[in-house]
């Protein structure tokens, strides 16, 4: 995974693990990571995925309708090491 990636943030660690497994079953490269400080919400864990898989992630989101979803974010590591995080608006009904 590179310096540009997606983050799915949840309120429940159980949902983080379930969504990560659903992504992997669908062929999406995903991993559980600490939630970036800029999101500052949820259970402290999130699912990281490649932005190239954004469409597949949206399909898994629609198919599984995960509970406790806070939102999807686009993260970018700046040259100085800072992490910039912005809402993506993948989730159905999400207005980020």
Predicted features and spans:
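C-terminal structural segments of small proteins and small subunits
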Residues: 58-96
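Amphipathic, hydrophobic secondary-structure cores in small proteins
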Residues: 4-7, 11-60, 65
């Amino acid at each position: 995974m590179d310096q540009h990636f997606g983050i799915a943030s949840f309120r429940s660690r159980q949902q983080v693990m379930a969504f990560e497994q659903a992504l992997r079953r669908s062929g999406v490269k995903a991993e559980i990571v600490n939630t970036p400080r800029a999101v500052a919400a949820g259970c402290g864990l999130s699912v990281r995925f490649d932005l190239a898989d954004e469409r597949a992630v949206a399909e898994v989101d629609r198919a599984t309708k995960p509970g406790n979803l806070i939102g999807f974010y686009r993260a970018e590591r700046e040259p100085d090491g800072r992490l910039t995080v912005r809402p993506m608006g993948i989730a159905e009904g999400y207005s980020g």
